[in-house]
């Protein structure tokens, strides 16, 4: 410390000079003010004759002091000198072009120190975790030391080093030395990487590990620029092997929901590792590796093993998780989409194809549609591809059984619109009809629906069984919107007929009041336009004279106002309200016309045989048997059948039940003849097929008339485009042959597959 004073003095003297110029305090920066005493003066500045020199041994002495400070930092001992003094010493040396030597000397000191650190790490006896802690301590010490060293040599770093692009900064030099002499050592690097992978492996197995240690070491590898080549490649390789084996094992051992939960958990864990200690650049390949091995390699197996069960059980959370996970991997959504479609087609086919399930088919379809809609809405995030393929799948399976679904959908609408349906409010009924219309869109045979819908609508209108005129018209509006005005024109005509009939009956009743005293029968007639309504087979029955007379009176009245028209009575559609006297008192019966004719016979006698009733009424055999069944074998047994039994035989006798009892005053006896029979179904379907033949013939003639000459394949293709119902190639061929036989068209003599229109 004895010579510290003189050193300070020389440094101070050196720093006090500025190129030999000392600026007097009296000098101003600008010219002298005008009006001042004395003349103008010149200031002459001369350069030093000799360049200022550092004191002898200054460089060596200063470096010795700096070297001592660096060694003290590296050995974690106290520094004898003030840091500001050391910084000033570096600046002094740099100002006198000693920078290259100073940089080399500093590098050598740092390199010697780093090289000396490698020896303890070459001991084989070190435990992996202990080794990692030791290397981490070494790294932390090195970083702390280089920060302090750089702060002392900052002037060197910001001048000489900055001006020489080939030289690394002092901090980068420290990283380079640590990388070259410690972490690039084969044994050290191997033990470091293996130790890190061991800790990560333990953590993946559920053990608690020192995450801060991992974070520090991986940050070290990243700073030393060996992270990607030395660690990441090996880490991803081990990750790949781990999850490949895990995926194979767990797919065998676990159910799909449990497996998907495990995949989600693994993805969350790996994402957390990236956030906590891995480099951000590892995130994409790491997550992709987990997704590929746990999901991508098992897409089909997962779907085959679990999708059907999840959908059957309506496991919404599990399906949501499946969709979210499958959306992460290439081809995942597509695979899910295809299996989803196959499930819909398979499950839907079981609903429509089995005749034993016809009773519940439409409700099952509606429930199934609600279910898949909910899955798309909640689980599949309203994905358009899933919505569109769901619609295609419904259309595919619902048409695997031609015609029947269309017929049953029409009947389902009838059950909802019929009076007595108490299960829904107006708003609920509207929603039900909207859902039914969705099913209606899927069916190809819309003409079959129309035929059965028209037949059921006729019954509702004629027997007064419609629950709501508003609901009826709402359904009509939906059909019109879906299929166009041509589809609903006849249905709308039926409503118009009913409204006109009401007006006609008002005038007829006024006419009857003016003509004579009212009779025992109050007649109401519905005038139906034959082209609008279903075709009904006329049945000639024996009406009571009073009914016949009233019919003639109405006929005369109507034709008097509408000359040129023809009336045809449809007895099968008639119904009446009869009054009857029993021992217990009076009752009223709401019955069909056929039931009316049978019951009126018992005004003339107490008992009749089946043959006698048949002769007296003229009702056809099968219709009469159903009528007598409703009167003698149903809940309201107005007649007593002898012998007892559910079936009506030829020799049966029927007696008036004078002891008939019922809690209601007006009793509706089930109108069995109004219920659809197998014959009616066949008849309705046959009429649809007949109408289709007419439409095919008309389309063929229309096309040939316009094109004159056309090949068979082109004609068939054109027909498929024009016809609005499903048709088989064989059916088209039959219609073409029929038109050729009827001379509407002819084959080309040289080319049988070519047709010519015959004018």
Swiss-Prot record:
Which biological process annotations from GO are given for this protein? cell population proliferation; cellular response to UV; DNA damage response; DNA repair; hemopoiesis; in utero embryonic development; negative regulation of granulocyte differentiation; positive regulation of cell population proliferation
Q: What is the documented function of this protein?
A: Core component of multiple cullin-RING-based E3 ubiquitin-protein ligase complexes which mediate the ubiquitination of target proteins. As a scaffold protein may contribute to catalysis through positioning of the substrate and the ubiquitin-conjugating enzyme. The E3 ubiquitin-protein ligase activity of the complex is dependent on the neddylation of the cullin subunit and is inhibited by the association of the deneddylated cullin subunit with TIP120A/CAND1. The functional specificity of the E3 ubiquitin-protein ligase complex depends on the variable substrate recognition component.
Q: Which Pfam families match?
A: Cullin (PF00888), Cullin_Nedd8 (PF10557)
Ordered alphabetically, the record's keywords are: Biological rhythms, DNA damage, DNA repair, Host-virus interaction, Isopeptide bond, Phosphoprotein, Ubl conjugation, Ubl conjugation pathway
Q: Which Gene Ontology CC terms are recorded?
A: Cul4-RING E3 ubiquitin ligase complex; Cul4A-RING E3 ubiquitin ligase complex; cytoplasm; nucleus
Describe the protein's quaternary organization and the partners it interacts with.
Can self-associate. Component of multiple DCX (DDB1-CUL4-X-box) E3 ubiquitin-protein ligase complexes that seem to consist of DDB1, CUL4A or CUL4B, RBX1 and a variable substrate recognition component which seems to belong to a protein family described as DCAF (Ddb1- and Cul4-associated factor) or CDW (CUL4-DDB1-associated WD40-repeat) proteins.
Modification sites for Phosphoserine = 10
Give the taxonomic lineage as stored in the record: Eukaryota, Metazoa, Chordata, Craniata, Vertebrata
Pathway(s) of this molecule: Protein modification; protein ubiquitination
Which protein is depicted?
Cullin-4A
What family classification does the UniProt entry report for this protein? Answer: Belongs to the cullin family.
Q: Where is this cross-link: Glycyl lysine isopeptide (Lys-Gly) (interchain with G-Cter in NEDD8)?
A: 705
Expressed, tissue-wise, as follows: Expressed in oocytes (at protein level). In the ovary, also expressed in cumulus cells. Expressed in testis, spleen and kidney.
Span list, region Disordered:
1-40
């Amino acid at each position: 410390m004895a010579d510290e004073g003189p050193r300070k003095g020389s440094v101070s003297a050196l720093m006090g000079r500025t190129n030999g110029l000392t600026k007097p305090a009296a000098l101003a920066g600008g010219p002298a003010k005008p009006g001042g005493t004395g003349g103008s003066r010149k200031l002459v500045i001369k350069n030093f004759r000799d360049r200022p020199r550092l004191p002898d041994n200054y460089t060596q002495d200063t470096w010795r002091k700096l070297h001592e400070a660096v060694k003290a930092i590296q050995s974690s001992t106290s520094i004898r000198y003030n840091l500001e003094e050391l910084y000033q010493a570096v600046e002094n040396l740099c100002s006198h072009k000693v920078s290259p030597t100073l940089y080399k000397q500093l590098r050598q000191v740092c390199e010697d120190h780093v090289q000396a650190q490698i020896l303890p790490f070459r001991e084989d006896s070190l435990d992996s975790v202990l080794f990692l802690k030791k290397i981490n301590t070494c790294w932390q010490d090195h970083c702390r030391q280089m920060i302090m060293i750089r702060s002392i040599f900052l002037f060197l770093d910001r001048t000489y080093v900055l001006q020489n692009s080939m030289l690394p900064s002092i901090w980068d030099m420290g990283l380079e030395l640590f990388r070259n002499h410690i972490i690039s050592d084969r044994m050290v690097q191997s033990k470091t990487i293996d130790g890190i992978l061991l800790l990560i492996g333990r953590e993946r197995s559920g053990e608690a590990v020192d995450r801060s240690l991992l974070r520090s070491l991986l940050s070290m590898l990243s700073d030393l620029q060996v992270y990607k080549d030395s660690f990441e490649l090996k880490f991803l390789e081990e990750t790949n092997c781990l999850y490949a084996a895990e995926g194979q094992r767990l797919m065998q051992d676990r159910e799909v929901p449990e497996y998907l939960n495990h995949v989600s958990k693994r993805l969350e864990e790996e994402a957390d590792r990236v956030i906590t200690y891995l480099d951000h650049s590892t995130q994409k390949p790491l997550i992709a590796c987990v997704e590929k091995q746990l999901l991508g390699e098992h897409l089909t197996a997962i779907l085959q093993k679990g999708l059907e069960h999840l959908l059957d059980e309506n496991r919404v959370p599990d399906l949501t998780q499946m969709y979210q996970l499958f959306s992460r991997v290439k081809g995942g959504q597509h695979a899910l989409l295809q299996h989803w479609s196959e499930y819909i087609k398979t499950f839907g086919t079981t609903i429509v194809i089995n005749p034993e399930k016809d009773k519940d088919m439409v409700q099952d379809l509606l429930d199934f549609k609600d279910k898949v809609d909910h899955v798309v809405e909640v689980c599949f995030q309203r994905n358009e591809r899933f919505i569109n393929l769901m619609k295609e799948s419904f259309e595919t399976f619902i048409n695997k059984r031609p015609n029947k679904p269309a017929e049953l959908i029409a009947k389902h609408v009838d059950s909802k619109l019929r009076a007595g349906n108490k299960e829904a409010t107006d708003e609920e009924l509207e929603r039900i009809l909207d859902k039914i219309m969705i099913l209606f869109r899927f069916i190809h045979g819309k003409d079959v629906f129309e035929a059965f819908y028209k037949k059921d609508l006729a019954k509702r209108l004629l027997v007064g069984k419609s629950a709501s005129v508003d609901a009826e018209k709402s359904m009509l509006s939906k059909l019109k919107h879906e299929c166009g005005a041509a589809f609903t024109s006849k249905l709308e005509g039926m409503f118009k007929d009913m409204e006109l009939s009401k007006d006609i009956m008002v005038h007829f009743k006024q006419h009857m009041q003016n003509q004579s005293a009212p009779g025992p029968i109050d007649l109401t007639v519905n005038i139906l336009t034959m082209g609008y309504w279903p075709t009904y087979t006329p049945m000639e029955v024996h009406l009571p004279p009073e009914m016949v007379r009233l019919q003639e009176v109405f006929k005369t009245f109507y034709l008097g106002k509408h000359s040129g028209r023809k009336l045809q009575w449809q007895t099968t559609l008639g119904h009446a309200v009869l009054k009857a006297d029993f021992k217990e008192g009076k009752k009223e019966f709401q019955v069909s016309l056929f039931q009316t004719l049978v019951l009126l016979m018992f005004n003339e006698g107490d008992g009749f045989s089946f043959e006698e009733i048949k002769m007296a009424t003229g009702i056809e055999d099968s219709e009469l048997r159903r009528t007598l069944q409703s009167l003698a074998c149903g809940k309201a047994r107005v007649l007593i059948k002898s012998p007892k039994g559910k079936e009506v035989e030829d020799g049966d006798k029927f007696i008036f039940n004078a002891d008939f009892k019922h809690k209601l005053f007006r009793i509706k006896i089930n109108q069995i003849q109004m219920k659809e029979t197998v014959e009616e179904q066949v008849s309705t379907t046959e009429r649809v097929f007949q109408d289709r033949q007419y439409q095919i013939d008309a389309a063929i003639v229309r096309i040939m008339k316009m094109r004159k000459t056309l090949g068979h394949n082109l004609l068939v293709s054109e027909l498929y485009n024009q016809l609005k119902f499903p048709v088989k190639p064989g059916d088209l061929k039959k219609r073409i042959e029929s038109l050729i036989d009827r001379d509407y068209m002819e084959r080309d003599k040289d080319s049988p597959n070519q047709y010519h229109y015959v004018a």
